[in-house]
């Protein structure tokens, strides 16, 4: 079944959904404390180039996706040396009914970022998150390195 995938800029009206999704076991496994993550999502959109969106399948919000500027961070060290033009992606699907749509969601977001003029994208899934890694590979991301906890993957526009 084909879905219409769109992205709605996150605002305060989404916070109750984000909080609920961040508490879901399948999200919590890979993301941090729900309240801390919610604060980071709200903070990021204001001052560091992070753009957060609710993922909407047809007319239903099902998760969260963001693009961010890795060059603005050095939390784990791998971000150092990346060009300011590189965009990072973070994503989770909160609604269990929407699991299995990751490839379509990521593909649509990649298309959006490429259309906006971004040519180099990175993502850093946990090494143990094999389902996410497979989805990113299906979209076209390739491994270029790793940290103690993450696989570093990139996708460059051809």
Label each PLM-derived region with a short phrase:
Residues 20-34:
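Helix-loop element at the rim of GNAT/NAT acetyltransferase active sites that forms part
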Residues 93, 114, 122-133, 149-158:
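Conserved beta-strand-loop-alpha-helix junction that forms the acyl-donor binding cleft
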Residues 103, 108, 127-145:
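Conserved active-site alpha-helix within GNAT-family acetyltransferase domains
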Residues 1-13, 158:
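Conserved N-terminal entry element of GNAT/NAT acetyltransferase domains
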Residues 41-98, 112:
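Acetyl-CoA-dependent GNAT
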Residues 2, 137-138, 142-158:
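Terminal substrate-recognition subdomain of acyl/acetyltransferases
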Residues 104-120:
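Conserved acyl-CoA
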